[in-house]
From Swiss-Prot:
Comment block on domains: The IMP cyclohydrolase activity resides in the N-terminal region.
Superkingdom of origin: Bacteria
Occurrences of domain MGS-like (ranges): 1-152
GO biological process assignments: 'de novo' IMP biosynthetic process
SUPFAM superfamilies referenced in this protein's UniProt entry, alphabetically: Cytidine deaminase-like, Methylglyoxal synthase-like
Source organism: Mycobacterium tuberculosis (strain ATCC 25618 / H37Rv)
Protein name per the record: Bifunctional purine biosynthesis protein PurH
């Protein structure tokens, strides 16, 4: 019998949980309300050990637990009680004829499959943690939400006790619980299917791009808005992935915005493109400045900021090492939206916290590799993340097209400029000197304009500097622009039908020119 709002009293509960958190309190509350509890294995033992009345499921089924616990609840006397739609008189009559009672509440959580995989367990141990009976019970109860409520998370137990006091769950509440239950099962199944695909049955030769692709995310936070105030937005995290910015700890400041996250992600990745101590300053997903230093992180930040102080105002800063007090003192004099680092030296956070609004994050080092997803109309593009690990990213594999071989200092700057170029939106030209960008031309629809922009931003600092281009020069004009401004050495992928003309222009200008054979477009 249910009320006008579909509230159905709870008389009988089936409980089978791996995670015993809150179990005893839940069982005590159910028992005190007169609810009959049927349970399985270790769950039943935990309840019984506290003196709470509980019926073992094998007593209900008349069939023992077998096959090392693989079969406990896969029985008609269980699933008929889960699936009977009590709105239908014929279902109620069938239960009565069979001597089966319905369950109004099912509390189940599943074997820890993902945690077992993450622990490095053997294949057999992982397979053993693929739950069968649990998902079957959850799906059955969720399907039958007009008659039963299902709870899969210990955080929901307080809601069960509240519903008991109110006379049961309403239909609307059972619908919500059913939705959560199916989400839980879907996430679990995706984890199992993905692991099976990658570990037991990889496809060849395109194992990285299988016929089926599944992934699940959980909402971490609601954001004030998206890129613009009229766009709603939220942050989601992948619970199975290496911890990243979505899991970063915020130590100080206002809540992160959508744009804060996109810029912080670009800055974080740019800083870790370099092995030396590095600081990247990002605005609208493009670098205002990137610099490395063998002296200190404060020195790297100073050099990065000097590249374009005007654009760095309101920027996002990332460091690939601990932020020192000295760097924090400098940052505190500049309007900065976000700073993210693997850690902060004693006293550095106190200095940064003088600024009420600066967002201070600490995050784990980004994991190399992985895939990038980009939605398009009607589908999704997936590609391997662009890492600086191509054959041509190693300067030992570069080809000297013209000019004298670069001396060690010049070659070091060329390597830095080449690696910094990956973080710049195409078409990209980076001019660098002394381990720092001095002029960045980004996001232009032709390469000569990118060169002009980089030269304009670099000013007098361009003379004697080096430059990198993320893709080949399609015409000599881009290289000629750099040479005319005083650039002495350039590195680019090569591969244009006009490579010979570009090389001739470099030779004529006395510019050393290297070819990498690798490209780093970023759109």
């Amino acid at each position: 019998m249910s009320t006008d709002d579909g509230r159905r009293p709870i008389r009988r509960a089936l409980i089978s949980v791996y995670d015993k958190t809150g179990l005893v309190d839940l069982a005590q509350g159910l028992s005190a309300a007169g609810v009959e509890i049927i349970s399985t294995g270790s769950t039943a033992k935990t309840i019984a050990d506290t003196g709470i009345p509980v019926t073992p499921v094998e007593q209900l089924t008349g069939f023992p637990e077998v096959l090392d616990g693989r079969v406990k609840t896969l029985h008609p006397r269980v699933h008929a009680g889960l699936l009977a739609d009590l709105r239908k008189s014929e279902h109620a009559a069938a239960l009565e004829q069979l001597g089966i009672e319905a369950f109004e509440l099912v509390v189940v959580n599943l074997y820890p499959f993902s945690q077992t995989v993450e622990s490095g367990a053997s294949v057999d141990d992982c397979v053993e943690q693929i739950d069968i009976g649990g998902p079957a019970m959850v799906r059955a109860a969720a399907k039958n939400h007009p008659s039963a409520a299902v709870v899969t998370d210990p955080l929901g137990y307080h809601g069960v006790l509240a519903a008991l006091r109110a006379g049961g769950f309403t239909l609307a509440e059972r619908k919500r619980l059913a939705s959560l239950a199916f989400q839980h099962i879907a996430e679990y199944d995706i984890a199992v299917a993905s692991w099976m695909q990658q570990t037991l049955a990889p496809e060849h030769p395109v194992a990285a791009f299988p016929q089926w692709f599944g992934r699940s995310w959980r909402r971490v936070a609601m954001l004030r808005y998206g890129e613009n105030p009229h766009q709603q937005a939220a942050l989601y995290g992948d619970p199975t992935a290496w911890p990243g910015l979505a899991q970063a700890e915020q130590l100080h400041g206002k809540d992160m915005s959508y744009n804060n996250f996109t810029d912080a992600d670009a800055a974080w990745r740019a800083a870790f493109d370099h092995e030396q101590t590095c600081v990247a300053i990002i605005k609208h997903a493009n670098p205002c400045g990137i610099a490395i230093s063998s002296v200190s992180v404060a020195d790297a930040h100073r050099k990065a900021h000097e590249c374009d102080p005007l654009s760095a105002y309101g920027g996002v800063i990332a460091a690939n090492t601990e932020v020192s007090v000295e760097m924090a003192e400098y940052v505190s004099t500049i309007f900065t939206e976000v700073i993210v680092a693997p850690g902060y030296a004693p006293g550095a956070l106190d200095v940064l916290a003088r600024k009420k609004n600066i967002r201070v994050l600490v995050a784990a080092e980004p994991l190399a590799g992985g895939s990038e997803l980009r939605p398009i109309s009607g589908g999704l593009l997936i590609q391997q993340s662009d890492q600086l690990d191509a054959h041509g990213d190693n300067p030992a594999n570069w080809t000297l097209a013209t000019g004298s071989p670069a001396d060690p200092a010049t070659l070091t700057d060329l390597v830095f400029a080449w690696r910094a170029c990956r973080a710049v939106k195409s078409n990209a030209i980076v001019i660098a000197a002394d381990g720092a960008t001095v002029g960045v031309g980004m996001g232009q629809v032709n390469r000569v304009d990118a060169a002009r922009l980089a030269v304009e931003r670099g000013g007098e600092r361009v003379r004697g500097a080096v430059a990198a281009s993320d893709a080949f020069f399609p015409f000599p004009d881009g290289l000629e622009t750099l040479a005319a401004a005083g650039v002495t050495a350039v590195v680019h992928p090569g591969g244009s039908v006009r490579d010979e003309e570009v090389t001739e222009a470099a030779a004529k200008a006395g510019v050393t020119l290297y070819l990498t054979g690798a490209r780093h477009f970023a759109h």
